[in-house]
Amino acid sequence: MIRLASVGDAAELERLNAEFNGKGKTTEESIRASLLTNRCEIVIVADGNGGRLAGFVCVQLKKSFCYDEYMPEITEVYVRPEYRGRGVAREMLIFAQEYCKKIYPLHSFELLTGSDNTAAQKLYSAIGFECDGEMHMSKQVK
């Protein structure tokens, strides 16, 4: 089942995030706090077997005075290896889009992915995402 994450998912989300981004990037407590207080992020999860989660999607809700609409950006997509190839990521992404369309005024979705992640890019293209000519840049701040 695809659904919004709840505070009760914090421990399992910590395990998933450790698989995805590496151990020590966050804690169960910080995830719980974020799920309770972060109104700029929507977290979608897919239920797996035995009380475990199969994956998650994070959507950041960007809003600027320059535009009337929200600009949601999908920033994280992770599916455990044993659930890959079953349409779990596709289902979570579609759920995220449909949920956001119901709640927020918007006309587009943005998505951030690695330039070398061709498998993910293929999925994103298949559900209607396309390169928009924008370039994502970052800078380390010490």
For every predicted segment, state its role.
Residues 80-82, 86, 115-116:
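Active-site acidic-Proline motif in GNAT/NAT acetyltransferases
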Residues 4-8, 14-69, 75, 93-94, ...:
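Acetyl-CoA-dependent GNAT
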Residues 90, 115-133:
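Conserved active-site alpha-helix within GNAT-family acetyltransferase domains
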Residues 83, 87-95:
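Conserved acetyl-CoA pyrophosphate-binding loop and the N-cap/start of the following alpha-helix
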Residues 138-142:
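Short beta-strand-to-coil "C-cap" segments at the C-terminal boundary of structured domains/repeats
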Residues 5, 77-79, 113:
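Hydrophobic adenine-recognition pocket in adenosine-nucleotide-binding enzymes
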Residues 101-113:
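Conserved GNAT acetyl-CoA-binding A-motif
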